[in-house]
Amino acid sequence: MRRLGISIYPEHSTVEKDKEYLTLASKYGFNRVFTCLLSVDGEKEKIIEEFKETISHANALGFQVLVDISPAVFEQLGISYNDLSFFHELGAYGIRLDVGFSGLEESIMTYNPYGLKIEINMSNGTKYVDNIMSHRPNRENLIGCHNFYPHRYSGLSYDHFITCSKQFKDYGMRTAAFISSFDATYGPWPVTEGLCTLEQHRELPMTTQAKHLFATELIDDVIIANAYASEEELQALGALNKEKQTFDIGLYDTTTELERIIVLDEPHFYRGDVSEYMIRSTQSRVKYKKEEFKPHNTREIKRGDLLIDNEQYGQYKGELQIALKDMVNTGKTNVVGRIVEEEIFLLDYLQAWDKFGFTLKK
C-alpha cells in the first residue's frame, strides 16, 4: 500500500506547532513522518525530551516516524550500531542513515531487538545496497529513501533516479522519495529553494509531483520534505488516488452534461489494442449507445485533449479517448476537455489495461 508523509524539524520549530501540523496531516490520511536530529548542541536533555514528546504525539495519531541521524550525533550520543535502544526509547519507527557504514553494520542493525526499520540512502548510485544484501540482512527491516535537494538545479536527474530506484526495487524493498510544498517555508538548512528529490519537480504542483513518483511504480511512500505544507495542499494530496493514475483536467463550456458524466463519473481503462495516437476507453459507447452525441467543438486535436466521438462516427459514438498526438479532426470527434499542461507528460506512464480517472481542476 502506498503512503503519504510529512516532515518536521523540531530544532527549527516548537513542539506545539509540530503537534498541530501532525494532527492536521493525520486528518487527511498522512501516516509517515521524516524528521532529523541534526545536533545535540546546547541543552541535550531538553532536545531529546522534546523529540520524545513530538514522536509520542505522532505515534498516538498512527504515524510511523523515521529519524535521520548524522554521524556526528551518533558520536555525540555514544550510539553504536550494536545498540539502538536510544531510538527505541525515543519512540521512533526506524532510523535513516544518510551516510552509511560498510554494509556489515547495516546488516547487523536490521536484526535489532526492537524491530526498528533501517532506512538507507537511495540516491548515490553505488553498489551500496548490493553490499548490504551480501551481508544477509533481515530484509523485513531494511527500507530505502532518496535524498531531497534544497539547492536549485542540484536535484536528481530523471535517468539517475530511475537507475537508483530500480536497484532497490529489484530487491523488493519499500522505497520513498520527497516532494516539495510551495507554501512551506523551511527545511533542515537555511537554503529553501524547494526540497524535492527530482529536479524536474521543483516548479510543479505538489499533487503532480506525487502522481509522477507513483506513476514510475518504483516509489511506495511520498513525503513532503519542507514544513509546513498548507491545509489546502494536505487536503489535495490526501484526496489523491495513490493506486490509480488520475489527471487534472478542464472541461469546455460546450461540453454536454452526458459528456461530463462520461469523463468524470464513468470508470476508465486503457484498451489493450494500443494505438500510438490515442488512449481509448470504450465502455461508455456501449452504455450510452442509445443516447445522442451531437457534433460540437470539432477543432483540430492536440496531444492532451479529451475526446468523445459524436454520432457521425457510427458505432464509435460515446467512446472516450485521450489524444497522444496531434490529429486532424474530420468533424466526427468532440473535443470536450483537456489535461492541464503540467500533467500531459504523465500520459507516457499509462500502459495497456491501466485504470485511470480525471479530476476537474477548480
Where are these regions (language model features)?
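Catalytic beta/alpha-barrel core
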Residues: 36-38, 44, 68-71, 92-103, ...
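Catalytic alpha/beta core domains of metabolic enzymes, predominantly
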Residues: 121-253
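Short, acidic/polar
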Residues: 13-26, 76-86, 129-130, 205-212
